[in-house]
């Protein structure tokens, strides 16, 4: 044998012609083999491997594929015990989205201080179902919450699409990208694991929760407890705030001895904001009946639906919430919200419902 050449891309080209991303991956693979060889030969027992910005020059799919393997937990792997510890420092939500929750450490500037603090999730006791839910939840889009200066948790896509627009129209300085605020939809009403993730015992990232009142008798998520279970809450939303969210935000000393009403009253001071009905209904009641009618007409050719929204535009007081929400759901809440946001932007008016204004004021104060 006179020459030995390592080929890549199915043998089409040599290593010298590799892209920077491919070269980085090859280098890491060779380093891993080297460390394993040293252990096998008894020259080393353990290796501590630090990788700075591993996402460099790799497209998103490869980032997730490669580092899912690097970051796998002992339980997920049938391989023998690891002979190395890996530290990744990253700005990539793709890498963050495949990291086990218990392995995450977030470094952030301490509010009002001139130093950096590290927050780890290793000490937060999530039950197995909540942990798995969170790891599934934190996809590439939501993975940005690890890098956020502030987070607003909402129930669905309608709020996620509309909130940045409503905030900017309310106050031009409320540019979420400039402020580092992420709006994260939890896709339901089970806020508890996410409150624990972001709260004082978790990452301690400033956050607010926006949730619906959902009066008794309305169709709501099956994640919610029935208000009649304890005979106290007037709605699913009130029960959700007190029994599911606030118990994770108040200290045991502050929680003990408090009545349901006292805890509910304290919610806004902890960044939890409840509307009067549901997001779409509250937004409609902020003098936006014409914008809602224009949105429906732009998304569907259903004449009866057009007539209903024309009637609402002429007299908003005749609103039937059930039919109203049914019509919006028929075209898709997310699609409706995106079109409505563009109409709001074209109009340029401040149409922010009061509970959202309160949440925005809360976030501004936290990030000041």
Model-based region annotation:
Residues 5-141, 168, 344-368:
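Switch/communication elements of ASCE P-loop NTPase nucleotide-binding domains
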Residues 99, 105-368:
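Acidic, divalent-metal-binding catalytic cores of TOPRIM
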């Amino acid at each position: 044998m006179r020459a030995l050449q390592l080929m890549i891309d199915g043998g089409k080209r040599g290593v010298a012609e590799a892209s920077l991303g491919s070269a980085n991956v090859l280098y890491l693979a060779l380093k891993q083999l080297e460390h394993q060889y040293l252990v096998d030969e008894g020259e080393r027992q353990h290796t501590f491997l630090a990788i700075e910005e591993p996402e460099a020059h790799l497209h998103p799919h490869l980032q997730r594929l490669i580092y899912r393997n690097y970051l796998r937990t002992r339980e997920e792997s049938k391989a023998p015990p690891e002979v190395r510890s890996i530290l990744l420092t990253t700005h990539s939500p793709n890498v963050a989205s495949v990291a086990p929750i218990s392995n995450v450490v977030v470094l952030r500037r301490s509010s009002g201080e001139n130093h950096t603090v590290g927050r780890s999730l290793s000490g937060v006791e999530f039950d197995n179902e909540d942990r798995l839910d969170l790891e599934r939840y934190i996809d590439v889009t939501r993975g940005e919450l690890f890098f956020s200066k502030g987070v607003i948790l909402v129930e669905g896509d309608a709020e996620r699409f509309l909130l940045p627009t409503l905030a900017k129209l309310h106050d031009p300085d409320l540019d979420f990208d400039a402020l580092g605020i992420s709006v994260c939809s939890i896709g339901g009403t089970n806020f508890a694991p996410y409150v624990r993730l972001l709260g004082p015992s978790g990452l301690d990232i400033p956050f607010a929760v926006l949730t619906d009142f959902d009066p008794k008798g309305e169709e709501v998520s099956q994640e919610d407890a029935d208000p009649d279970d304890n005979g106290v809450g007037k709605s699913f939303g009130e029960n959700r705030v007190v029994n599911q969210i606030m118990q994770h935000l108040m200290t045991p000393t502050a929680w003990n001895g408090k009545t349901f009403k006292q805890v509910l009253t304290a919610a806004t001071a902890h960044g939890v904001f409840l509307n009067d009905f549901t997001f779409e209904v509250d937004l409609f009641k902020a003098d936006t009946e014409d914008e809602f009618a224009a949105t429906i007409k732009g998304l569907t050719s259903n004449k009866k639906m057009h007539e209903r929204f024309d009637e609402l535009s002429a007299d908003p007081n005749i609103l039937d919430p059930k039919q109203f929400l049914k019509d919006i759901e028929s075209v898709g809440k997310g699609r409706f919200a995106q079109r409505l946001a563009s109409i709001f932007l074209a109009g340029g008016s401040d149409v922010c419902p009061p509970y959202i204004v309160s949440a925005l004021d809360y976030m501004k104060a936290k990030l000041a």
